[in-house]
């Protein structure tokens, strides 16, 4: 926002706000809206951005709502796929990891269904994609070996140990993308990750020319700048 000539009112520590006194989210949003032209909201509770948007007189940008959605990440992910693979033909995209709690894959799966994309989903038992986000054409696996050679995009996301039940803890570390997988993968495929990573994506793959996750991260700045421009200017063309 600053690079675009605007300013930011950061609120990272709620102990200094009325939230610490018991103020509800809706009243907090009404207060912040009186000082700003837009609110970027990250909240631990699923659905928080929708509640905020229902009462806010200014635009709400959802920067992540618990295990719900992460729309701006999905937009930069879509841009990355468009730039490195293309969306003008039928492509295959693999989503791997904790698909139950991974808000980035929730939003991305919604966007990809607007294109000619077949989704391949790889997750530990108990961490599958929520049923409302699946489709009968999806391919579902428990091992990446079953589909790594068939896909154009390998989108890896971490198992979120802070959110999973104790009986699923043994899944940690079992869902990794390895150099051995990439031997089987297409030469034109790409590796993506929303970051941060833990052990599901080893640094030994960073030098693989198919690894685009650091570029993906950099695109985030430009895509989010474009979102602000779209909100604040009617004259800016908005298309991929």
Language-model-derived ranges and their functions:
Residues 19-21, 69-76, 130-132, 151-152, ...:
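Short, charged, surface-exposed secondary-structure boundary motifs
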Residues 2-82, 199-201:
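Phosphate/diphosphate ligand-binding glycine-rich loop within oxidoreductases
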Residues 59-64, 140, 211-215:
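Short hydrophobic/aromatic-enriched beta-strand-loop microsegments
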Residues 132-210:
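Rossmann-like adenosine-cofactor binding region
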Residues 11, 63, 122, 157, ...:
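Generic beta-sheet signal
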Residues 2-5, 83-157:
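Glycine-rich phosphate/diphosphate-binding loop of Rossmann-like nucleotide-binding domains
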Residues 188-189, 194-240:
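Adenosine-phosphate binding glycine-rich loop
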């Amino acid at each position: 926002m600053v690079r675009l000539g605007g300013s930011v009112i950061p609120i990272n520590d709620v102990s200094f706000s009325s939230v610490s006194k018991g103020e509800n989210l809706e009243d907090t949003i009404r207060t912040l809206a009186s000082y700003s032209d837009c609110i970027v909201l990250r909240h631990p509770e699923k659905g928080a951005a929708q509640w905020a948007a229902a009462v806010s007189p200014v635009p709400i940008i959802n920067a992540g709502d618990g295990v719900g959605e992460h729309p701006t990440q999905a937009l930069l992910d879509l841009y990355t796929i468009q730039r490195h693979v293309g969306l003008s033909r039928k492509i295959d995209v693999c989503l791997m990891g904790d698909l139950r709690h991974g808000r980035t894959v929730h939003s991305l799966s919604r966007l990809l269904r607007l294109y000619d994309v077949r989704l391949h989903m790889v997750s530990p038992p108990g961490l599958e994609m929520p049923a409302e986000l699946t489709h009968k054409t999806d391919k579902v696996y428990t091992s990446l070996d079953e589909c790594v050679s068939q896909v154009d995009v390998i989108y890896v996301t971490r198992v979120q140990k802070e959110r999973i039940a104790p009986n699923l803890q043994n899944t940690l570390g079992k869902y990794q993308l390895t150099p051995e997988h990439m031997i089987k993968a297409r030469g034109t495929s790409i590796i993506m990750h929303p970051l941060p990573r833990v052990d599901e994506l080893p640094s030994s793959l960073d030098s693989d020319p198919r690894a685009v996750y650091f570029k993906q991260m950099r695109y985030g700045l430009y895509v989010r700048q474009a979102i602000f421009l779209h909100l604040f200017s009617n004259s800016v063309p908005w298309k991929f």
